């Protein structure tokens, strides 16, 4: 065996500066969070949502973006994984305006000092100019994720201004209507624009080329079909009809994991609503009965419980909310012990649309299994 530094250079693998991941075939990961912060800032910072003669409604601060965002290239395809939380301040500034003063109090008829609606010099009373007033608060977008990238995200808002008088209270009521009718839709629209820009910026060049080539091939095929002359069929012509081979439209996912806990504890993580909320950190619902419905990550994952065998097996129908209507997969989760102080968790999911397979697989690993192990310390070894 050669000593260190004496090996044949022809057999040494180097990390070269001029090396290339040809056609994006090998797995590569790019951190998109800095780009995301800059892009989201440009979409929101100081943007005017609505302006009238009466008020200006705008974003008043640079958005604060936290979370993670990566673009993973594998075999020429780009897989985006992101979970972002965005917060920003807003304000509605009511412009100064002229208002007529309240009418004077009318004294009894015939009084010597009756007050007319005009000043002592006979001129009408001057209008009063109101002061500029500002109502402010915060927008929060708690969950921009690849799980619900095709949907408008949830947007929450708070109002920081206190209604200390009737006039301010009236202004706040008006602002609440503005937030619902213009503020929330604006934030949702800008978030969806961010997703489009993200995919446009980081999608692999190979994937774009393949898409363009496919479009060109389709155009060529259509042109050829239009110009070709259909041959005449005579009595001596024999036609053989062959049944075209159908490509599969779904795939089956199989995952195995080891949890350092009992089968009942492992089972409970998937059916206990409090534990589901703990590791997903999101809105969840779960009817713990056969035939009961469930949803995770604010409805991004939906399904129905078919079989619930405590400590043994769970069978569910399962779908992502962006799948076509009527498309469902089936998930079977089994729990077993194999002589070690741990539980074997095996997940088999059938009927996954091919285009959604990699996203579904990564979602199970990253958003469910890894989170369970980290939240409940089920990955720690027992000696």
Swiss-Prot record:
Location of the region described as Disordered in the Swiss-Prot/TrEMBL record: 97-126, 209-228
Gene Ontology CC terms, in alphabetical order: cytosol
Principal localisation: cytoplasm
Parts forming coiled coils: none
InterPro entries to which the protein is assigned, alphabetical: Aha1, AHSA1-like_N, ASHA1/2-like_C, START-like_dom_sf
UniProt entry tagged with the keyword Cytoplasm: yes
MF terms in GO: ATPase activator activity; protein-folding chaperone binding
Keywords of this entry: Chaperone, Cytoplasm
Keyword Cytoplasm: yes
Cellular location(s): Cytoplasm
BP terms from Gene Ontology: protein folding
Assembly: Interacts with hspD/HSP90.
Role: Co-chaperone that stimulates hspD/HSP90 ATPase activity.
Entry similarity comment: Belongs to the AHA1 family.
Protein name per its UniProtKB record: Activator of 90 kDa heat shock protein ATPase homolog
Organism: Dictyostelium discoideum
């Amino acid at each position: 065996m050669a000593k260190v530094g004496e090996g044949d250079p022809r057999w040494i693998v180097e990390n070269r500066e001029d090396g290339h991941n040809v056609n994006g075939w090998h797995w590569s990961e790019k951190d998109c969070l800095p780009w995301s912060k800059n892009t989201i800032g440009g979409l929101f910072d100081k943007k005017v949502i609505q302006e009238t003669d009466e008020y200006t409604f705008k974003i008043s601060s640079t958005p604060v973006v936290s979370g993670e965002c990566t673009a993973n290239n594998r075999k020429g395809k780009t897989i985006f994984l992101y979970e972002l939380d965005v917060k920003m301040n807003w304000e509605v500034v009511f412009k100064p305006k002229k208002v007529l003063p309240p009418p004077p109090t009318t004294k009894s008829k015939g009084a010597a000092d009756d007050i007319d609606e005009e000043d002592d010099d006979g001129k009408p009373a001057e209008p009063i100019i109101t002061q500029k007033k500002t109502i402010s608060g915060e927008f929060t977008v708690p969950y921009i994720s690849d799980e619900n990238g095709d949907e408008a995200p949830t947007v929450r808002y708070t109002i920081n201004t206190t209604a200390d008088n009737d006039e301010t209270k009236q202004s706040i009521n008006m602002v609440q209507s503005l937030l619902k009718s213009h503020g929330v839709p604006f934030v949702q629209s800008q978030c969806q624009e961010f997703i489009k820009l993200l995919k446009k910026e980081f999608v692999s060049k190979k994937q774009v080329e393949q898409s363009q080539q496919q479009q060109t091939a389709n155009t060529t095929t259509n042109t050829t079909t239009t110009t070709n002359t259909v041959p005449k069929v005579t009595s001596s012509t024999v036609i053989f009809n062959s049944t075209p081979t159908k490509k599969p439209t779904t795939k089956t996912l199989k995952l195995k994991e080891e949890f350092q806990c009992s089968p009942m504890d492992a089972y409970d993580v998937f059916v206990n609503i409090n534990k589901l909320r703990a590791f997903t950190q999101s809105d969840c619902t779960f009817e713990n009965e056969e035939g009961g419905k469930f949803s995770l990550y604010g409805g991004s994952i939906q399904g129905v419980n078919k079989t619930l065998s405590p400590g043994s097996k769970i069978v569910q129908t399962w779908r992502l909310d962006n799948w076509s209507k009527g498309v469902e997969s089936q998930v079977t989760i089994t729990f077993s012990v194999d002589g070690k102080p741990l539980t074997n968790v095996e997940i088999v999911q059938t009927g996954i649309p091919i285009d959604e397979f990699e996203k579904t697989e990564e979602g199970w690993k990253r958003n469910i299994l890894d989170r369970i192990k980290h939240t409940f310390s089920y990955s720690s070894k027992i000696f």
